[in-house]
Amino acid sequence: MTQFTIASFNVKNLIGADKEYYKFQTYTPEEYAWKQDWLADQLLTMNADIVGFQEIFEEEALQSVIDEASVRADDLNAASVPDRSKRYHRKAIFRKLEVAPYRDAQLAFAPNSADTGEPGQRRPGLAILSRFGFSEPPEVIQDLPEPLDIPFSALRGVEDDAGHFRLRRVSRPILKARIPVGDQIITVFNCHLKSKLGEFDGPGPADLTQYDPMGRALGALRAGLRRMAEAWVLRREILKEIDQGRPVMVLGDFNDGEHAVSSEIISGETPFKNYAWMLRHDAKNSADRYSDAENTQITEDITARHLHSAERLFVRKSARDMVYTTAFGGVFESIDQIYMSRHFHPEFADRIGEMSYFSAFNDHLTDGSHPEAPYNKLASDHGQIMAHMTLMGGAD
């Protein structure tokens, strides 16, 4: 068996010191050193084999964090792991104490194609770090070769044009990597979908002294449409892999909870209990239902392409009732996700592996909207999540 861990880590605006990433937002050298220190320590604590990072402005800044984590791994191992001359060095507990550095790991960085480098107008990219390397060069998906046109259905009659939504590019890149783990190659997608922050047209809705509720509602609508369209672009890429029989894992900042429409677009439909109860799409009478054979076919077609939430699988098998990766305004929710194809589902007969545990690193999170709560802008405003996976077959 082969064991590995895979994690999602939104680092919150990683860029070097004295560089204005958003308007009037920079890190002093002292702040940058503190942030780098915290990130390296968090990466060391996680000790994940595969990490998807979001909100990376500079590859060099991330590489510095990774290098520092490797140095600390050496120091920690020297202090914690007994010398091999000791008779008890073979005890399993000491294997758990050891932390592998990332010196031999490979890093794939996807810069944001909309990032011009102009101070105050920067756009973040993302990255994947893999101790297993990559079986082929990772692929960046952002500017679409053909615009995505989403037509709206006519509500009455035979209207020629009920309107449509057009998407030419996703707001932040999607990074696709094929990673060799044990005797398998797993396709990993890292994403950061459009946030709920409204997209405002002109200065009016953005000027809070001239509050424009309709303009702000329209901004929220634009953001929601974009996020769901980006989810569909990601879903299209996921299906290309699944339909080739490839195991898939999807991670990142979805900016929505598990049951949001955008997340359900990514995961695909959950099969209905029995399609033989359903009225056929071409029914001629009220008793015209799908057959048992069609029910089996439909269920398999949907199940084969459905992704499963690592968090949900963990909650189902444990007594834990709450995992969260963000806190704001009294709302604690998970908007960072790890999804996986049925190749890793414990009830799938032909599974290649399954998740043994799920970790959430969220002790640093506080709800900054509460006056009594501490808040530190230098740490991440997201919790990190990690799935502990076991593959069947292969060397341990």
Where are these regions (language model features)?
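N-terminal, active-site-proximal structural segment of metallo-dependent hydrolase catalytic domains
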Residues: 1-126, 207-211, 352-354, 358, ...
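Beta-strand-turn-beta hairpins that frame and shape the catalytic cleft
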Residues: 1-6, 133-136, 170-212, 394-396
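Short, flexible helix-coil linker/hinge segments at the edges of structured domains or between repeats
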Residues: 142-164, 194-222
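Catalytic metal-binding/acid-base residues of hydrolase active sites
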Residues: 12, 56-57, 192-194, 254-257
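Short, solvent-exposed loop/turn elements at domain surfaces
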Residues: 14-19, 197-199, 347-348
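A long, amphipathic alpha-helix that forms part
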Residues: 217-245
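A well-ordered secondary-structure block
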Residues: 113, 118-121, 125-182
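Metal-dependent phosphoester-hydrolase catalytic domains
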Residues: 59, 129, 133-140, 146-152, ...
